[in-house]
C-alpha cells in the first residue's frame, strides 16, 4: 500500500489535539492514519535553518519539520505568499505589493523544500501538496526526477484571468501548476477560472470534462469542497455554559444575538458588515434595545499596514454606531479584537439567534458550516451568508446575500430575526444534511481516491514534458 506524503506550509505539532488543530489538520491526520505516511512542513521557527530535519513518529505517521532563515521566511511567506498571492487571489489587486526579490525568494524556498523532501520519498509514495505557498512545488520535484503522483489542493479562491493575469509572474505560475497530476479546488467557479487563465496563455487539450493537457503535461482538475467535523462540533456546542457566559445569557434572555467571528482580514468584509448592521438599526427601529451584534475579530498579520487600517476603521465604526444608536442599558454593537477558545465559540454559536458570515471573497469559510453544526436542531439560529463564500454553493438554505449591498444584508438580518421556528428548523435541517454528508473525512477520502487512480508519470513522459510545448496560436 502506497504511503501518503502531505506537504503544507505549516504542520500541526504531533502533540496537538486534533480538536484544537483546526479543520485542515483533522482532515490531513485522518488521511495519514488511513494510509500511513509523512507530514512535511515548516516548524514555525526561524534560525538554525541548516540543522537536520526534526522528525517525530507516532504510530504510522512521521512529522518532519524544518526551520527557515529570516530572509527566506520574509521573502517567501510575508512578501510573496501574503503580500502578492493572498490579495490577488482574493481579488484585491490594489493591495498587491510585487517585488522581484520576493518572487525570487518564493521560488528559492520551494526549491529548498524540494531538496529537503527528496531523500524522504519512496517510489510509490502519493504526494499531496496544500495551498498557495507551494504553487511551484511539483515543478521543483519533477526537475529532480520525481515521477510520483502529486496532487494539489487550493484552499483559497482562484481568480479570473482579469485578476490573475495582472500578476507579473502569472505565466510561470500557470505552467508550474501543470506539473501536478491532480489540481483540486473549493468550487466549480475556481476550477473554471484556472482553466480560463490557462486557455488564455496556451493551448489546452481537454480529453474528457476534467482531464487536460497543456505544454505536453497531462493533469486533472476537480472540485473538493472542504468540510468540518459536525459531530465533534455539536459535542463541543452542547453541555453547560461556563459560569460567566451562563450569567451573560441570563442577562440577555430577552435580547436576540447576532454573532460573527472572523480573522481580522480585508477579505472578510468586516467594515461592510458594520455598515449593514447600521442600516438594520436605521431601517428597522423596532429592533432597538432588543438585539445585539457581537463581532469577534482577532488580529492576524498585525504588522501589515492593510490590517492595521482595518482594525482602526472597525474601532472607529463601532464607536460611531454605538454613539449614534446606543441607549442607557443597551449597547447595540460589541467589537472584540481578541482570541477566544474554539470550544467556547461553538457554545456561543449555539446560543446565537443569527450567524452573520459575509466575506467579500472566501475559498470556503468553515465558520459558516461550524455555525450550522453547532445549532440545537429543535431551536436553531439562522445563517446569513455571503454569495461570495464557497460555502454558499452548498448551504443554499442560508439567507444568501451580496455583502456589498448593505440594504440587502440589513433586510436579511431582519428576516432572520423574525423567522418562524418551523422555517428555521427546515432550513437548518437541509444545511446540516449537506454538512454531514460532505464532512472533512469525505473531503480527504475523495481527493486521495482520485489521486490514487492516476497512472504515475514515467521517466519517458517526464522527458517529453521538457521538450513538448504547444504555444497558443494567435
Curated annotation (Swiss-Prot):
EC code: 2.4.1.15
Description of activity control: Activated by potassium and other monovalent cations at 0.25 M, but partially inhibited at greater concentrations. Inhibited by validoxylamine A 6'-O-phosphate.
Pathway per the UniProt entry: Glycan biosynthesis; trehalose biosynthesis
Effect of a null allele: Mutants are viable, but osmotically sensitive in minimal media and sensitive to cold shock.
GO function term, MF aspect, one: alpha,alpha-trehalose-phosphate synthase (UDP-forming) activity
SUPFAM superfamilies associated with the record: UDP-Glycosyltransferase/glycogen phosphorylase (SSF53756)
InterPro entries assigned: Glyco_trans_20 (IPR001830), Trehalose_OtsA (IPR012766)
Family per similarity comment: Belongs to the glycosyltransferase 20 family.
Name of the molecule in the record: Trehalose-6-phosphate synthase
Organism of derivation: Escherichia coli (strain K12)
Gene giving rise to this polypeptide: otsA
Amino acid at each position: 500500500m502506497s504511503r501518503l506524503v502531505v506537504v503544507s506550509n505549516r504542520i500541526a505539532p504531533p502533540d496537538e489535539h486534533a480538536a484544537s488543530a483546526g479543520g485542515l489538520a483533522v482532515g490531513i491526520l485522518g488521511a495519514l492514519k488511513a494510509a500511513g505516511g509523512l507530514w512535511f512542513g515548516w516548524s514555525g521557527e526561524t534560525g538554525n535553518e541548516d540543522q537536520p530535519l526534526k522528525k517525530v513518529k507516532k504510530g504510522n505517521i512521521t512529522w518532519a519539520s524544518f526551520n527557515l532563515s529570516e530572509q527566506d521566511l520574509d521573502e517567501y511567506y510575508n512578501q510573496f505568499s501574503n503580500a502578492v498571492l493572498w490579495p490577488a487571489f482574493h481579488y484585491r489587486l490594489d493591495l498587491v505589493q510585487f517585488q522581484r526579490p520576493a518572487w525570487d525568494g518564493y521560488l528559492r524556498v520551494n526549491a529548498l523544500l524540494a531538496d529537503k523532501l527528496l531523500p524522504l520519498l519512496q517510489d510509490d509514495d502519493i504526494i499531496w501538496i496544500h495551498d498557495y505557498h507551494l504553487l511551484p512545488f511539483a515543478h521543483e520535484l519533477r526537475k529532480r526526477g520525481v515521477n510520483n503522483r502529486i496532487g494539489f489542493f487550493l484552499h483559497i479562491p482562484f481568480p479570473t484571468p482579469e485578476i490573475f493575469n495582472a500578476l507579473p509572474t502569472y505565466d510561470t505560475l500557470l505552467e508550474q501548476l501543470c506539473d501536478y497530476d491532480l489540481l483540486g479546488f473549493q468550487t466549480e467557479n475556481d476550477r473554471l477560472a484556472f482553466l480560463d487563465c490557462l486557455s488564455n496563455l496556451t493551448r489546452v487539450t481537454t480529453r474528457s470534462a476534467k482531464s487536460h493537457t497543456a505544454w505536453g503535461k497531462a493533469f486533472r482538475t476537480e472540485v473538493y469542497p472542504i468540510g468540518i467535523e459536525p459531530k465533534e462540533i455539536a459535542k463541543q456546542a452542547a453541555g453547560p455554559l461556563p459560569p460567566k457566559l451562563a450569567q451573560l445569557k441570563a442577562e440577555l434572555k430577552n435580547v436576540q444575538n447576532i454573532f460573527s467571528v472572523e480573522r481580522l482580514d480585508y477579505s472578510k468584509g468586516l467594515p461592510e458588515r458594520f455598515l449593514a448592521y447600521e442600516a438594520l438599526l436605521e431601517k428597522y427601529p423596532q429592533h432597538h434595545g432588543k438585539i445585539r451584534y457581537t463581532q469577534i475579530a482577532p488580529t492576524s498579520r498585525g504588522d501589515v499596514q492593510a490590517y492595521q487600517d482595518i482594525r482602526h476603521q472597525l474601532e472607529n465604526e463601532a464607536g460611531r454606531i454605538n454613539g449614534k444608536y446606543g441607549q442607557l442599558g443597551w449597547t447595540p454593537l460589541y467589537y472584540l479584537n481578541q482570541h477566544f477558545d474554539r470550544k467556547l465559540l461553538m457554545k456561543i454559536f449555539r446560543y446565537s439567534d443569527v450567524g452573520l458570515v459575509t466575506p467579500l471573497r472566501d475559498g470556503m469559510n468553515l465558520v459558516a458550516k461550524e455555525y450550522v453544526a453547532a445549532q440545537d436542531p429543535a431551536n436553531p439560529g439562522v445563517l446569513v451568508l455571503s454569495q461570495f463564500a464557497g460555502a454558499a454553493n452548498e448551504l443554499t438554505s442560508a439567507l444568501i446575500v451580496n455583502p456589498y449591498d448593505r440594504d440587502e444584508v440589513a433586510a436579511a438580518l431582519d428576516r432572520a430575526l423574525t423567522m418562524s421556528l418551523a422555517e428555521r428548523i427546515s432550513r437548518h435541517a437541509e444545511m446540516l444534511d449537506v454538512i454531514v454528508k460532505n464532512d472533512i473525512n469525505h473531503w480527504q477520502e475523495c481527493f486521495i481516491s482520485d489521486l490514487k487512480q492516476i497512472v504515475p508519470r514515467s521517466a519517458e513522459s517526464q522527458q517529453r514534458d521538457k521538450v513538448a510545448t504547444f504555444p497558443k496560436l494567435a
